[in-house]
């Protein structure tokens, strides 16, 4: 059995509605403490300015968080036109101010240039690393270092409204897309400059928006549990989504109970009628209990890649 760690062995995913002004790591630690979880990890940082969906993986769900990092995201963003900042958002210093002299046709053309497959040069104020150090550390020292343009895809970019100097957009994009950079680049295309004043992540993969929960709501449940004299987990755990929702889009392969011990020890097993080049979601027996992900190896066997560790006293 795996080595015990401090905290509760609780597995699942909390769809946190991160508040503005809080780092993603701080939000993660708050959720971990509330659930008294032994392990926790988030699935893609949001800027402190940003709000919205931050899936927090607890326990064994952390093994599958990478697949949510790789998932598409959706954002609602409001930009202030006419001002450019050094961070491309309202947390930074204004570096230029220019009047708004563009037409609706020019705006439409500029927006269209971001749709589809493009290359994006990441902002210096990002967590990407150069020679082992995050770019934002160089930026804070007034240094600029080389950054390679990275391929991104904007599946949808919808114009919502333009009120005065504030432009609101809805953007559905691939992993690794920096919304701040899109807004900064848009401002330069329009000749007026722009920066983000509101950013909200409304979707990660296919997770339902209505299942998001705030830190305040979680803490209120803790207080309610104390008042009612019940275990906090009785009120908190129903908010968790199953850990296999992180890999819900993977093809399922179901294995019989008889071969489960062999597979769960890390050995490849033979399965009938499966010939996929992609990762597979492995379920066990008639109950279809999720046990991990695997892939078909060169010998045509199902080889486990990441397996769930189950505890006898798992809550």
UniProtKB/Swiss-Prot annotation:
Pfam families: TruB-C_2, TruB_C_2, TruB_N. InterPro entries: PsdUridine_synth_cat_dom_sf, PsdUridine_synth_N, PUA-like_sf, PUA_sf, tRNA_psdUridine_synth_TruB, tRNA_sdUridine_synth_fam1_C, TruB_C. It is an enzyme of class 5 (isomerase). Its EC number is 5.4.99.25. SUPFAM superfamilies: Pseudouridine synthase (SSF55120), PUA domain-like (SSF88697). Responsible for synthesis of pseudouridine from uracil-55 in the psi GC loop of transfer RNAs. This is tRNA pseudouridine synthase B.
């Amino acid at each position: 059995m795996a080595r015990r760690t401090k905290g509760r062995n609780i597995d699942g995913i909390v769809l946190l509605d991160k508040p503005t002004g809080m780092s993603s790591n701080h939000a993660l630690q708050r959720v971990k403490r509330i659930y008294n979880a032994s392990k926790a990890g988030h699935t893609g940082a949001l800027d402190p300015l940003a709000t919205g969906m931050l899936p927090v993986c607890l326990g064994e769900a952390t093994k599958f968080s990478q697949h949510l990092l790789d998932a598409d995201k959706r954002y609602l963003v409001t930009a202030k036109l006419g001002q450019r900042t050094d961070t491309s958002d309202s947390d930074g210093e204004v570096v230029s101010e220019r009047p708004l002299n563009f037409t609706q046709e020019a705006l439409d053309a500029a927006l269209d240039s971001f749709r589809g497959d493009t290359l994006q040069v990441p902002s210096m104020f990002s967590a990407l690393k150069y020679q082992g150090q995050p770019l934002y550390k160089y930026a804070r020292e007034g240094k600029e270092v080389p950054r390679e343009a990275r391929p991104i895809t904007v599946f949808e970019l919808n114009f919502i409204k333009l009120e005065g100097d504030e432009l609101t957009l809805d953007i559905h994009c691939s992993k690794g897309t920096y919304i701040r950079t899109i807004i900064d680049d848009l401002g330069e295309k329009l000749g007026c400059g722009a920066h983000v004043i509101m950013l909200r992540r409304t979707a990660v993969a296919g997770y339902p928006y209505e299942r998001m929960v705030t830190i305040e709501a979680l803490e209120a449940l803790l207080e309610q549990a104390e008042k009612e004299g019940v275990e906090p987990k009785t009120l908190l755990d129903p908010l968790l989504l199953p850990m296999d929702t992180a890999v819900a889009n993977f093809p399922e392969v179901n294995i019989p109970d008889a071969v489960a011990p062999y597979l769960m020890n890390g050995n490849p097993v033979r399965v009938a009628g499966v010939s996929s080049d992609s990762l597979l979601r492995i379920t066990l027996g008639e109950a279809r209990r999720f046990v991990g992900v695997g892939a078909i190896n060169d010998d045509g066997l199902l080889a486990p890649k990441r397996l769930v560790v189950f505890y006898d006293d798992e809550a």
